[in-house]
């Protein structure tokens, strides 16, 4: 489909423009499991501001299940260290709102309120493969392990 590296769109919006289609109609396969993404997974991919990858010139995204699995594997294999918000600002000499911090689980970029929540609750941000992670509001909630009576 796209052979030249220069012409390969990296975002889903750019890919839709190149293919003259919309986010609501495009069909992409998962780069890991090769299944076609569900519509909600396509929207999640856009919302998380993830990048398209290419295999043999064809565009691929990643499904929700594979993304969570890859995030967990990356956390185990490439964890470097953790810092509190204030220390992170001092280390990078930037305000938290200027630092790209993604959710450690779903990879969505954290908004200023989610970053503030980490600071207010004295939670750390984690450096994994040189990228900063925390938890978004959706993934922050603990999951119930069993039915409570």
UniProtKB/Swiss-Prot annotation:
<feature type="zinc finger region">
    <location>
        <begin position="103"/>
        <end position="139"/>
    </location>
</feature>
<comment type="subunit">
    <text>Forms homodimers. Interacts with ubiquitin-protein ligase UBE3A/E6-AP and thus forms a complex with human TP53. Interacts with human NFX1 and MAGI3. Interacts with human IRF3; this interaction inhibits the establishment of antiviral state. Interacts with human TYK2; this interaction inhibits JAK-STAT activation by interferon alpha. Interacts with host DLG1; this interaction leads to the proteasomal degradation of DLG1.</text>
</comment>
<comment type="function">
    <text>Plays a major role in the induction and maintenance of cellular transformation. Acts mainly as an oncoprotein by stimulating the destruction of many host cell key regulatory proteins. E6 associates with host UBE3A/E6-AP ubiquitin-protein ligase, and inactivates tumor suppressors TP53 and TP73 by targeting them to the 26S proteasome for degradation. In turn, DNA damage and chromosomal instabilities increase and lead to cell proliferation and cancer development.</text>
</comment>
<keyword id="KW-1048">Host nucleus</keyword>
<keyword id="KW-0010">Activator</keyword>
<keyword id="KW-0244">Early protein</keyword>
<keyword id="KW-0862">Zinc</keyword>
<dbReference type="GO" id="GO:0039648">
    <property type="term" value="P:symbiont-mediated perturbation of host ubiquitin-like protein modification"/>
</dbReference>
<dbReference type="GO" id="GO:0052150">
    <property type="term" value="P:symbiont-mediated perturbation of host apoptosis"/>
</dbReference>
<keyword id="KW-0238">DNA-binding</keyword>
<keyword id="KW-0945">Host-virus interaction</keyword>
<keyword id="KW-1092">Inhibition of host IRF3 by virus</keyword>
<dbReference type="Pfam" id="PF00518">
    <property type="entry name" value="E6"/>
</dbReference>
<dbReference type="GO" id="GO:0006351">
    <property type="term" value="P:DNA-templated transcription"/>
</dbReference>
<keyword id="KW-0863">Zinc-finger</keyword>
<feature type="short sequence motif" description="PDZ-binding domain">
    <location>
        <begin position="147"/>
        <end position="149"/>
    </location>
</feature>
<dbReference type="GO" id="GO:0006355">
    <property type="term" value="P:regulation of DNA-templated transcription"/>
</dbReference>
<keyword id="KW-1090">Inhibition of host innate immune response by virus</keyword>
<keyword id="KW-1119">Modulation of host cell apoptosis by virus</keyword>
<dbReference type="GO" id="GO:0030430">
    <property type="term" value="C:host cell cytoplasm"/>
</dbReference>
<protein>
    <recommendedName>
        <fullName>Protein E6</fullName>
    </recommendedName>
</protein>
<keyword id="KW-0805">Transcription regulation</keyword>
<dbReference type="InterPro" id="IPR038575">
    <property type="entry name" value="E6_sf"/>
</dbReference>
<dbReference type="GO" id="GO:0039548">
    <property type="term" value="P:symbiont-mediated suppression of host cytoplasmic pattern recognition receptor signaling pathway via inhibition of IRF3 activity"/>
</dbReference>
<keyword id="KW-1113">Inhibition of host RLR pathway by virus</keyword>
<dbReference type="GO" id="GO:0003677">
    <property type="term" value="F:DNA binding"/>
</dbReference>
<dbReference type="InterPro" id="IPR001334">
    <property type="entry name" value="E6"/>
</dbReference>
<keyword id="KW-0899">Viral immunoevasion</keyword>
<keyword id="KW-0553">Oncogene</keyword>
<keyword id="KW-1035">Host cytoplasm</keyword>
<dbReference type="GO" id="GO:0030165">
    <property type="term" value="F:PDZ domain binding"/>
</dbReference>
<keyword id="KW-0804">Transcription</keyword>
<dbReference type="GO" id="GO:0039502">
    <property type="term" value="P:symbiont-mediated suppression of host type I interferon-mediated signaling pathway"/>
</dbReference>
<comment type="similarity">
    <text>Belongs to the papillomaviridae E6 protein family.</text>
</comment>
<dbReference type="GO" id="GO:0008270">
    <property type="term" value="F:zinc ion binding"/>
</dbReference>
<feature type="zinc finger region">
    <location>
        <begin position="30"/>
        <end position="66"/>
    </location>
</feature>
<dbReference type="GO" id="GO:0042025">
    <property type="term" value="C:host cell nucleus"/>
</dbReference>
<keyword id="KW-0479">Metal-binding</keyword>
